Amino acid sequence: MTEQHTPAEAPSVPRAASRVRASSLVGRRWLNTGGDQVTLEDLRGKVVVLDFWTFCCINCLHVADELRPLEAEFEDVLVTVGVHSPKFEHEADPDALDAAVERYEIAHPVLDDPELTTWQAYSARAWPTLVVVDPEGYIVAHLSGEGHVAGLYSLVQELVAEHEAKGTLHRGSGPYVPPAPVARDLKFPGKAIALGGRGTEPGSLLVADTGHHRIVEVASDLTTVLRAVGGGDPAQAPAEAAELALPTPGMRGHRDGGPDEALFSEPNGLLLLPEDVAAEVGYDVVVADTVNHRLRGLSLATGEVTTLAGNGVQKLIDSERVREAARDEEGVAVDLADIDADPLAVSLSSPWDVAWDAAAGRVIVAMAGTHQLFSFDPVARVLSVWAGIGLEGLTDGPADEAWFAQSSGLSVDAEGTLWVADSETSAVRRVRTGDDGARTVDTAVGTGLFDFGHVDGDPAQARLQHPLGVTALPDGSVLVADTYNGAIRRYAPESTDAAGRAVPASVSTVTRGLAEPADVLVEHGEDGAPQDIVVVETNAHRLVRIAVPGEYLTVDEGARQTARPRTDVVAGELELTVGFAAPSGQKLDERWGDPTQLKVSSSPESLLLDGAGTSVGLTRTLRLDPEATEGVLHITARAAACDGEHGRPIPDNAACHLYQQDWGIPVRVHAREAAPEGAETRLDLDLRGLH
């Protein structure tokens, strides 16, 4: 039986008699400081938020967006330091990190921590992790996951009041030095589609100019911009834009209207609707407006932009602004909007790509932020979950039980199979619909969240590295934008040659040496055969055309695993505790019982003899197989809190908040008699821990 645990409410600062001094910030170099090194001693007198992140991680990008208004409000007393601790090998490349900081508009100092030195010093175990340091240099909070912004507001206010009274708060500017702006025609383009005969001129393409927060049409030369919608004109000076009451060049935001008025925020996926559907609904293109958490519609004739789905509030994790709460089967509060509601009232989460399923008559949406696929019927205006339970990982089976991980690319082939670039598992997945209408998910390439590499050959042994794009070819094969390997790869399913002999499935490399390719599309000749490949080369800020090669490459640079430190544990009982303290001004929502939950599993499954499964409470006794040597513990913790005062009932109209984090913790298992010094018999994690 699982022990139940009810966490305590958050105390006011100071929180503990014994305080822990924050560790030094050690890494390879600093970004956004004008070349200066930064130490915690330099930051004395400021409230410091250390944001442990990695640029592949959608949850980390959500946290960066959450922090922007907090940083703006407390700009004279708060310093955020991004500690970049990479998951993938490519993320340790300094040029790749430079590009990511620019692309995601990170406006605070960033410590490059490729060896995870500072990550380990602060006992970080998950991306993202936030550590709050007070103006005297002591750790006061350790937060995992998203959705902490309301609690951070109250915590920062308390710290400012306390240290202003003590005389230990220093107001003024911090160490952030903005980089010099660079003018470009395209800036970190994300996705592209061919317009066929529906563009301004033959052979033109529509491009998500993601870094400029706009959509552009480019000519067949892939460089000439024919027209732009949203974001302002990057060639126009800001003063001129203000004088004309137009959006500032590269302005992000959400606004419907004509091409000069509309605003997007990091748009990515694009879909050209069939002409008959477009005529019925009044727009031609569906846009995945990623950071606005919305689907948008674009008329090619007028440039008019409308909002199709999404209320602008990020689904599930970023629940700080959601005013209504639902409950799942365990009684835990969640902020899922009613999927049967008006699509404009539904919360989405970082839609990254869109594709058309002709058989279903629906737009399929890669909902990267919740690790799911959604569908949208543009005629009936109905939104629904297409596949995925909402947990991050690689699990095949019935669509409503499958696990995805930040799906970022979609393509439907001639047989109706939906191909998915599942970026965080470095996998290519597929969703197939049976004659009975039931959908199933399986994996063509890839093995899990922490396995990657550049290996061709047998799909069972092949490896990718964070692919973001996929396109199906007429011969049944699939091209993959293998983003972090800088390559275009090809998956060919099992087939039969002209002589009737079986040809096994295989993975090969089409081309390499690209700068983070995020999408790939194929141009066909007059005979319908593939002729050229167009690649969206994101970090080169361009589209590039590549001839289809006569032969494909076979590459084997080895399989890799994410280099996370392993925790030595003793076989047998392992006590798991997740700390959670509700922020000031909130209290645990106990109206329907214990509002906390743990979900535990392991890879391999045999690692856990007891303690797997889902139940309420934030403590559990796990039992590890003494025959096991190593593995990964997968832990998901949830807690629900609502605005309210301690000792008083929660008001009926109170805003409720869901806190959630997933951990994948590599462990090395030792027999008790042979365990090294320091091997753990308990595992303490923080969902929201105060010190």
Where does each model-flagged region fall?
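N-terminal "domain-start" segment that seeds a small globular fold
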Residues: 2-40
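Conserved redox-active cysteine motifs that mediate thiol-disulfide chemistry
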Residues: 52-69, 587-588
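Structural microenvironment flanking redox-active thiols in thiol-disulfide oxidoreductases
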Residues: 61-103, 114-118
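Short, internal strand/loop/helix patches
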Residues: 98-127, 131-133
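Thiol-/selenol-based redox modules, centered on thioredoxin-like
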Residues: 134-200, 552
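Gly/Pro-rich loop segments of beta-rich domains
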Residues: 170-190, 222-269, 303-352, 382-406, ...
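Residue-level detector of Asp-centered blade-edge/turn motifs that repeat once per structural unit
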Residues: 194-202, 272-281, 356-360, 412-415, ...
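Extracellular/lumen-exposed scaffold segments
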Residues: 223, 548-691
